[in-house]
From Swiss-Prot:
Its cofactor is [4Fe-4S] cluster. Belongs to the IspG family. Transmembrane segments: none annotated. This is 4-hydroxy-3-methylbut-2-en-1-yl diphosphate synthase (flavodoxin). Gene3D superfamilies: Dihydropteroate synthase-like, Sulfite Reductase Hemoprotein, domain 1. GO terms for molecular function: 4 iron, 4 sulfur cluster binding; 4-hydroxy-3-methylbut-2-en-1-yl diphosphate synthase activity (ferredoxin); 4-hydroxy-3-methylbut-2-enyl-diphosphate synthase activity (flavodoxin); iron ion binding. It comes from Maridesulfovibrio salexigens (strain ATCC 14822 / DSM 2638 / NCIMB 8403 / VKM B-1763) (Desulfovibrio salexigens). The keyword Nucleotide-binding does not apply. Binds 1 [4Fe-4S] cluster.
Amino acid sequence: MINRKKTRELFIGDVGIGGDNPIRVQSMCNTDTRDALSTRAQIDALAEAGCEIVRVAVPDEEAAKALPQIRKGSPVPLVADIHFDYRLALSAMEAGIDALRINPGNIGGEDKVDSVVSAAKERNVPIRIGVNGGSLDKALLAKYGGPTPQAMVESALEHVALLEKRNFYNTKISLKSSSVLNTIAAYKLLAEKVDYPQHVGITEAGTLVRGAVKSSVGLGILFWEGLGDTMRVSLTHDPVAEVGVAWEILRSLGLRERGPEIVSCPTCGRTEIELIDLAQKVEDNLRGVEDVFTVAVMGCVVNGPGEAREADIGIAGGRGLGIIFRKGEVIRKVKGDENLLPEFMKEIELFLKEKRGQ
């Protein structure tokens, strides 16, 4: 049983963060924000996949001018990612953005910080302080001998102090590093010092497999420790894939569930069907289904139903014959490998209608 650390509650749009709220799934568009249509299309795709908050880069005024069109009717709250230029933060808030990712210590003098904080207060816009181990201040790097967890936390607290000095507490913090161990240590240290909500992730995690593994290890340990209020799985891949990995991490730890869990055997010499292809096609066909249930795809008619008896519905294939089962009990036999997928999907549709009471 995971006992989550209680943090301050804040809202990004209508999505509750921290407090008693669940861990929220977040991602970031990789489109050019100046292209409002493609950016909005990706936001819609992310939302359909289960993303609850989306961040967009705002590198210049042209991107800021596209925000109203992107924001209008968005299915999820949006966070504007701002670097250095306080005017972009002001423009983003005027456009109706739901939150900012900006480091107040990097935007210039006190008057500029005052302007951003004043506007954020007026519009109830939270600010995420985002510390990255790869871009720490040179003085901190010299003090700690590198991008250590202590250096990352001190950097975050310096930014926090600028906001608290102005009585601004609508704040979330992230401490990201490409090192799993440094990231874990940094978040644990931060949690000892402040109770602001934490946005957790492993930055520059890598391509699909490497990034999914690093993120799963790092985030899994943080969640087990009770840390983390929002999450992003950073992948060098389609951002929609980040959302799927995030939900699987949450499901694996019993924290949240969304959509079917698909279990399948790793194949062996007894496998007599194209199981890898079948399992992938079942997963593809169920993408977008939000109902929570377990589907098994097994490669052996002898052991399959018994090994997957906990599955709500499953299929096991043999040479020219497949069996469909529910909770380990055979309900149908299917002849011909080419019929396995279509007949199984029909049974899943029937199962879902029954589950939904239709």
